Regions:
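C-terminal hydrophobic helical "lid"/dimerization subdomain
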Residues: 1, 265-310
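Glycine-rich beta-strand-centered segment in the early N-terminal region that forms part
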Residues: 21-38, 50-91
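NAD(P)H dinucleotide-binding glycine-rich loop of Rossmann-like/cofactor-binding domains
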Residues: 78, 88-151
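Short glycine-centered segments of the SAM/dcSAM-binding site in methyltransferase folds
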Residues: 84, 146, 170, 229-230, ...
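N-terminal Rossmann-like NAD(P) cofactor-binding module of classical short-chain dehydrogenase/reductase
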Residues: 86, 209-210, 232
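Mid-domain Rossmann-like dinucleotide-binding core that forms the NAD(H)/NADP(H) cofactor-binding site
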Residues: 121-193
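A short acidic, Gly/Pro-enriched loop at the edge of an enzyme's catalytic core
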Residues: 201-208
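Glycine-rich phosphate-binding loop and adjacent beta-alpha segment
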Residues: 213-277, 310
Length: 310
């Protein structure tokens, strides 16, 4: 089978299409014929060595997949051969998503939403679970809450806006002028152009901030929260200074790293199938163009998600 392998850390050009053996499913696992694989910022960080989750190369990066069950091992009861599935298996261990086939624990996958084709389904798991686990599981966002989503035009942000709206929240978001119309179509009630306006002046009395940017943005987000507000960060999980400053103000600071979650995947699928959640693809490229997909991710300018198809 084909797989995108890297033999060293570095820029996008370290990614190369190779031939390798097809994996075999073990107890409680399924073999998935991958039809599409999502490309995420974490993939680029692993590729560069900035976040060495997978140790030293060689390895095949990628977690988001959508495809068809081709083989099941003993112990699998949730799926049958031919079922269409999607998920983010094994995170943070190696899943090898940039390939024609992957094996995955059956309980880390869910049935693909009927309303989505494989590329759109592959774009959903990591970004969608990050948003869901941050807003719903960690912060308990619900009706009447006032939520600020940073970088609303990005992969996580554009899904977070819709999830918060589906749960009855008022949503503010930061975005560039070029993405303002896009985030409004997702349901954002107020758009703050971070290039011309200080969000700390424009946003006040916020119940929950979802930080997808980190650094000074995370720290200054404390200024916009109500006295009992919550900052959920998906990039500053181990920032002791941020946590201490939040505690000093009586605020909650929660760090969230997405983990495989079939319940969350099913909840996301339900939102998709009811029309409350749509996945925006910025670029769809063939597996052989993985390096170009990473260049797009590294640019930081994509609106929505980047996906590889097999």
């Amino acid at each position: 089978m084909r797989a995108v392998t890297q033999r060293s850390f570095g820029g996008p050009d370290v990614l190369e299409l190779t031939e390798t053996d097809r994996p075999r499913p073990h107890l409680n696992e399924v073999l998935v014929r991958v039809r599409a694989a999502g490309v995420n910022p974490i993939d680029a960080h692993v590729r560069s060595g900035a976040i060495p989750l997978l140790g030293e190369p060689p390895f095949v990066v990628g977690w988001d997949v959508a495809g068809t069950v081709e083989e099941i091992a003993s112990g699998v009861t949730r799926f049958a051969v031919g079922d269409e599935v999607f998920g983010m298996p094994l995170m943070p261990r190696a899943a090898g998503g940039y390939a024609d086939y992957v094996t995955a624990p059956s309980r880390q996958l869910a049935s693909k939403p009927a309303a989505l084709d494989h590329p759109h389904a592959a774009a959903l798991p990591l970004a969608g679970l990050t948003a869901w686990q941050a807003l719903v599981d960690a912060a308990g966002v619900g009706a009447g809450r006032r939520v600020l989503v940073h970088a609303g035009g990005g992969g996580v942000g554009h899904l977070a806006i819709q999830i918060a709206k589906a749960r009855g929240a008022e949503v503010l978001t930061t975005a560039s002028a070029a993405k303002a119309d896009f985030v409004r179509t997702l349901g954002a009630d107020e758009v703050i152009d971070y290039r011309t306006t200080d969000f700390a002046d424009a946003a006040r009395d916020v119940d929950v901030v979802l930080d997808t940017v980190g650094g000074d943005t995370a720290l200054r987000s404390l200024d916009v929260l109500r006295p009992d507000g919550t900052l959920v960060t998906v990039v500053e999980m181990h920032n002791a200074t941020l946590a201490r400053k939040a505690a000093d103000r009586g605020l909650r600071c929660l760090g969230v790293t997405a983990e495989p979650d079939p319940v969350g995947l099913t909840a996301l699928a339900d939102l998709v199938d009811t029309g409350a959640l749509r996945v925006h693809l910025a670029h769809t490229l063939p597996l052989s163009d993985a390096a170009q997909a990473h260049r797009l991710i590294d640019s930081g300018t994509t609106m929505g998600k980047v996906v590889l198809t097999t």
